[in-house]
Every structure is written in C-alpha cells, then in structure tokens.
C-alpha cells in the first residue's frame, strides 16, 4: 500500500513557494517591519578623503547672437580685447568698433575628486556672468580653474551642452529650462593633484553623514567582531580605526562592504511652502484629542446701476451690493488618538478626519506644542 502520491511540483519549488508565502504573511502582520541594512561606506566618509571645489573665469564663443552686449558688459569687452592681444591681435585703437554679440563671459566651476591624478578628466559647469540670453551652441575657451589657495589645479575647454533652448520673434519669445547654464562632460583636465597618502596611515576616522550614537556603536561593533578591537566610538559622528597592524587599503575595502543597520531618529520634517510632510517610521505620539475644522468667509461685491425715472432730475449712480457668506466647512468630530500611535495609524487617523496636508501641518504643530508629539519637529 502506498501512502504518498507524486506532487505536480518538485520539492524545491514547493519549498520556495512556502517560504515566499510565509514572508508575505509576516509583512502583512501589523507592526512588522524589516530593518534595512546598508553598507558602511554608504553612510560614512573617510577623514581627509573629499573633493575640492574649483572656479575660473573665461569666455564662451560661437554664440548665435545670444552673447553679451559689449556696450553693457565692460568686463566681457576687456577680457576679449586682452585675449586677442595675447594672441597677437591688437585692437585697442578700434575697440569702440567691437560690436560682436557672439561672445559671453562665464564662470566655470568644477569638483576635484579625491585620489585624482594629473591628466585625468573631470566634468565642469559653465554659467553666464553677463547679460547673455543663451549659451546654447557655444564653446568654452581654455580656462584655468583655481582652488581656494589660489593655485591652478585644472584647465577647462570644450563645447557646451545646455539641455535648453530659447527662441524669440518680434512680439513673443519662448524659453525652456535654463539656457544660460551649461555642462561640459570631461571638459576639464587635471594639472595638479591633491596629495593624500593612505598606505602609511596608522589611524583613520570614519565620519557618519548622519550623526547618531547607536549607529556609531553598531559600526564599531561589527568592525571589531570582524577584525578584532580596532574601532572606538569617539562621538556620534566619528569612529576611530587603528590600522597599525593592518593593510589600510584592503582593510578599508572590507570595512566598507560590512552591513550595518542605521538607527533613525524620530523626526518630522515640514515644508510649509509646498505643504510637504515627511515623517520617520519611529514617530510616536501620546494620547491626545484632535478636532479640525475650517472657517471660510466669502465677500462678494456686485455693483448695481441706479437709474432715476424720466424727468425726475435725478442722476445715474452706481450702488454697491455686498454679500457676505460664512462657511464653517463640514462638521468634524473630536477624535482621540491613543498613546503610542505609529506613523501609519497617525496618518490614517488624520485622513479619517478629512485633513489635508496644510491642515495636518497645523495639527502637528499643535500636538508638538501640547507635548504629545514624541519626535523632533523641523519646519522649513
């Protein structure tokens, strides 16, 4: 006698389906959340490893009549004359006849990444400094880029890509995006590098992008479990690494790939201008009663003409007619929000009251003032 029948699915397929079913069921349970683990290198920076900002001043040529008006932008005219003079073209005696509209003075900016070497290329951004209406189709002439110390670290040149257009006629014009700012991919060549020797560093600091004691402790804990006692938490932002007995490059590579679960503070960010509200998952409120309603006063002016009868000797006059209407909005009941309410429950409860984003901002401010909002409220 046989007690088993052959299943239409292989055992491995059934196992996978049961596992998926259990996982989906857990996700549907109230209050069940999955903490997201991230790599250490995605939430920290290494001390001393950073980019440096560069800036320069130059000329863009080849514009189709959309450049600076030389009579208004004196610096553009002087820069053009000086550049032509360096190239052996002397027009000082005829500078008043210089009437071109195909040149624009621009500011050039770029970021010099860490560990970059001479000859490497970087992206540059070009922005109009004068009254040019568009930089579309222009070419940036060779422009030195300096850092805050006044030294030249890169040189930029190339054709601009603006991702915009501008057209105008006798009575109308149209502009899409920002034609007075452009981008040159790989338009800068590094001439000087910032020295940074990582191979001989005995100590190194990891800097958290979002300072937090819990996250810093978790980072130090996972590093110490993997490499031994080499990590010490100095403050909520800094974890000190002792690499004296390790190869810094390979060790930092392995540390960066370690997974850690960052702790997020209970925080509510409100943008009053746009009505945007961002609330973290750990936001809680104590027991509080909420009632919300709107008051709208509408004043309508309807002027009427008063016409006197024939031969009455009266004069025609405009008589104002004012209608005032008060609307208190639909009636909302007083709702009691229990203590320990989560983000989902809070939003659902406020939506049940018919509360919009802007009204929700006022309610959150009132709850915070009452001391019932157990989170930081940041207004922007």
UniProtKB/Swiss-Prot annotation:
Its keywords, alphabetically, are: Bacterial flagellum, Periplasm, Signal
Q: Which residues form the signal peptide?
A: 1-35
Please name one Pfam family that this protein belongs to: FlgI
Q: Which family does the record assign?
A: Belongs to the FlgI family.
The listed locations are:
Periplasm; Bacterial flagellum basal body
The answer to whether keyword Signal applies is: yes
GO (cellular component) term, any one? outer membrane-bounded periplasmic space
User: Which organism does this record belong to?
Assistant: Gluconobacter oxydans (strain 621H)
| BP GO terms, sorted | bacterial-type flagellum-dependent cell motility
Q: Which gene encodes it?
A: flgI
* Superkingdom per UniProt: Bacteria
- Indicate the principal place this protein occupies in or around the cell: periplasm
Name the NCBIfam families for this protein.
PRK05303.1
Q: What is this protein called?
A: Flagellar P-ring protein
Q: Subunit arrangement?
A: The basal body constitutes a major portion of the flagellar organelle and consists of four rings (L,P,S, and M) mounted on a central rod.
MF annotations from Gene Ontology? structural molecule activity
Q: What job does the chain carry out?
A: Assembles around the rod to form the L-ring and probably protects the motor/basal body from shearing forces during rotation.
State the InterPro entries in the record.
Flag_FlgI
